[in-house]
UniProtKB/Swiss-Prot annotation:
Its main location: secreted. Keywords: Adaptive immunity, Cell membrane, Immunity, Immunoglobulin, Membrane, Secreted. GO terms for cellular component: extracellular region; immunoglobulin complex; plasma membrane. Immunoglobulins are composed of two identical heavy chains and two identical light chains; disulfide-linked. It comes from Homo sapiens. The gene is IGLJ1. This is Immunoglobulin lambda joining 1.
Amino acid sequence: PSRLLLQPSPQRADPRCWPRGFWSEPQSLCYVFGTGTKVTVL
């Protein structure tokens, strides 16, 4: 299965979605699927 990363996004950079990555933010969650579909939940 794809590796799912759960890490705080860099404060110096804006919230972004990374391929096959999972970013958890205080006010937003960014889900990235292998299909390239990006879903941002604010």
